[in-house]
């Protein structure tokens, strides 16, 4: 095996199938690029990202693990978020939750 190589069965791979999602329009109002990783609690992202923040509570980007989305200054884009799963406890990030999601 080559480092980073993936061997998978043929066919379609479904990520986060059947999980609750929300779609938001997000704009970078700052003067620096902002990159958000796949498992970052989107509600707690940089304040320069303008969007309906309360709708992102308990959600992360609906993208493959280990990837990210970059928002250039002045850029707006539509993103799909997926509900966090497991224990639904959030610690760290920007420190806005620090416990169980409500």
UniProtKB/Swiss-Prot annotation:
It holds the Pfam family Urease_beta. GO terms for biological process: urea catabolic process. Its EC number is 3.5.1.5. Pathway: Nitrogen metabolism; urea degradation; CO(2) and NH(3) from urea (urease route): step 1/1. The keyword Zinc does not apply. GO terms for molecular function: urease activity. Gene3D superfamilies: Urease, beta subunit (2.10.150.10). GO terms for cellular component: urease complex. CDD domains: Urease_beta. Keywords: Cytoplasm, Hydrolase. SUPFAM superfamilies: Urease, beta-subunit. The keyword GTP-binding does not apply. It catalyses: urea + 2 H2O + H(+) = hydrogencarbonate + 2 NH4(+). It is an enzyme of class 3 (hydrolase). It is found in: Cytoplasm. Belongs to the urease beta subunit family. Heterotrimer of UreA (gamma), UreB (beta) and UreC (alpha) subunits. Three heterotrimers associate to form the active enzyme. This is Urease subunit beta. It comes from Methylobacillus flagellatus (strain ATCC 51484 / DSM 6875 / VKM B-1610 / KT). The gene is ureB.
């Amino acid at each position: 095996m080559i480092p980073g190589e993936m061997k998978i069965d043929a066919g379609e791979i479904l990520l986060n199938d059947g999980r609750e999602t929300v779609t938001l329009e997000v704009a970078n109002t700052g003067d620096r690029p902002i990159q958000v990783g796949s498992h970052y609690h989107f509600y707690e992202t940089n304040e320069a990202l303008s969007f309906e923040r309360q709708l992102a509570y308990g959600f992360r980007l609906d993208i493959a693990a280990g990837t990210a989305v970059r928002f250039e200054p002045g850029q707006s884009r539509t993103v799909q978020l997926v509900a966090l799963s497991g224990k639904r406890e959030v610690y760290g990030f920007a420190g806005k939750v620090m416990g169980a999601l409500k």
